[in-house]
Amino acid sequence: SHIDGKTFILSPEESIRIQKGLNSDIVMVMDECPKNTKDYDKIQKSMELSSEWARRSKVSFGTNNHKGLFGIVQGGLFKDLRIKSLNNLIDIGFNGYALGGLAVGETQIEMFEVLDGIKDFMPKEKPRYLMGVGTPSDILGAVKRGIDMFDCVMPTRSGRTGLAFTWNGQIQIRNSKYKNCLLYTSDAA
């Protein structure tokens, strides 16, 4: 604790208990999201740990027909690890599947290659959620690759500071040249 130095252990079970206590509609399993690395062995160990935590999270979650429990696919930029992670999660059984460990330093091309490599293996009848992605080009590219859901602080942060995204690029809507502009932002740039 930052208050008194007391140690707290956040286990997969405790994470589920907290999220249920918050009355979350979608509950996420605990996972380990390693830095963007090319170290296959490190990514594999992290993926295996995340799969074990997903199993424990599912047991802790129990059956709840009014809430959704999402598994988080890990595996870095390695297609075989992503597919193995996804298959582990499918075997456990979840209401939806999130893709974690992307948008953490890799290029957009690398992110799209991961999505292209896994999209045909993801259950079509379940929601597909790409975590931490919020730029318009990332969202559009991910939707083309079968992703349904996104979350990111960037759109809110951008809007709060007056940054608007248009088909012609970003504009700072608070600039004086837009003071009397009556055009939609998509026409303003």
Model-derived regions: residue spans:
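Conserved small/polar residues in nucleotide/adenosyl-binding loops
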Residues: 184-189
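Active-site entrance/lid segments in N-terminal catalytic domains of soluble metabolic enzymes
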Residues: 1-94, 104
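Glycine-rich phosphate/ribose-binding loops and adjacent secondary-structure elements
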Residues: 60, 64-181
